[in-house]
From Swiss-Prot:
Subunit details: Part of the 30S ribosomal subunit. Contacts proteins S9 and S11.
An annotated Gene Ontology molecular function: structural constituent of ribosome
Protein's name according to its UniProt entry: Small ribosomal subunit protein uS7
GO cellular component terms given for this protein: small ribosomal subunit
The protein's role, per its UniProt record: One of the primary rRNA binding proteins, it binds directly to 16S rRNA where it nucleates assembly of the head domain of the 30S subunit. Is located at the subunit interface close to the decoding center, probably blocks exit of the E-site tRNA.
Record-linked InterPro entries: Ribosomal_uS7, Ribosomal_uS7_bac/org-type, Ribosomal_uS7_CS, Ribosomal_uS7_dom, Ribosomal_uS7_dom_sf
Similarity comment text for this entry: Belongs to the universal ribosomal protein uS7 family.
Amino acid sequence: MSRRHAAEKRVILPDMKYNSVLLSRFINNIMKEGKKALAEKIVYSAFDKIEKKHKADPYQTFSNAMNNVKPYLEVTSVRVGGANYQVPTPVDERRGYALASRWIITAATKRSEKMMIDKLAEELFEASNNRGVAIKKKEDTHKMAEANKAFSHFSPKKTKQGN
């Protein structure tokens, strides 16, 4: 791993249907073994299910779900004087959306419905209404950060630029 500079952020093209970079990242997270067409089919079919079953705008449901699941605090492990402390740190927007999509996909995978399309549609709809396993995961993360608020003065080290 090079110590000279951080890797460049890759430019992700927006998806074809809704012209959204966020949805494109979500599709990339769904994708397994490079099968992007299948991942797109799963997501767009789940969107159709949301539209038919719940009579709701699927993209609006998706963006509400992502915003509801996105955490604003998390704990990072910091070593101080031979002890590790769980220090609450704010989550930047990009990481927040990455965590949200990961949690939604994990929660959807563990659901009892038969097909991933149904699982994803239901989890997205529940998350948009502040229910479901993904929302529970966010709340647990925030509880951990709240419980370790006393260690917030041990903020993680900032890397020096230019050295």
